[in-house]
């Protein structure tokens, strides 16, 4: 999954991060209200968001070039 993220442009990474955050919030809401089919999905989403945050930070500090 990480290789797939690293091939994206900065704008695509930010868009993907936003969509994953929305999906994570929806999943959290479903967990509070009722039953979640795959409870491990929350962990996977949280880790993917962290990976994307790391890549964005690499762009910001200059480790990764645009």
From Swiss-Prot:
<dbReference type="InterPro" id="IPR001854">
    <property type="entry name" value="Ribosomal_uL29"/>
</dbReference>
<dbReference type="GO" id="GO:0003735">
    <property type="term" value="F:structural constituent of ribosome"/>
</dbReference>
<dbReference type="InterPro" id="IPR036049">
    <property type="entry name" value="Ribosomal_uL29_sf"/>
</dbReference>
<keyword id="KW-0689">Ribosomal protein</keyword>
<keyword id="KW-0687">Ribonucleoprotein</keyword>
<dbReference type="GO" id="GO:1990904">
    <property type="term" value="C:ribonucleoprotein complex"/>
</dbReference>
<protein>
    <recommendedName>
        <fullName>Large ribosomal subunit protein uL29</fullName>
    </recommendedName>
</protein>
<dbReference type="Pfam" id="PF00831">
    <property type="entry name" value="Ribosomal_L29"/>
</dbReference>
<comment type="similarity">
    <text>Belongs to the universal ribosomal protein uL29 family.</text>
</comment>
<dbReference type="GO" id="GO:0006412">
    <property type="term" value="P:translation"/>
</dbReference>
<dbReference type="GO" id="GO:0005840">
    <property type="term" value="C:ribosome"/>
</dbReference>
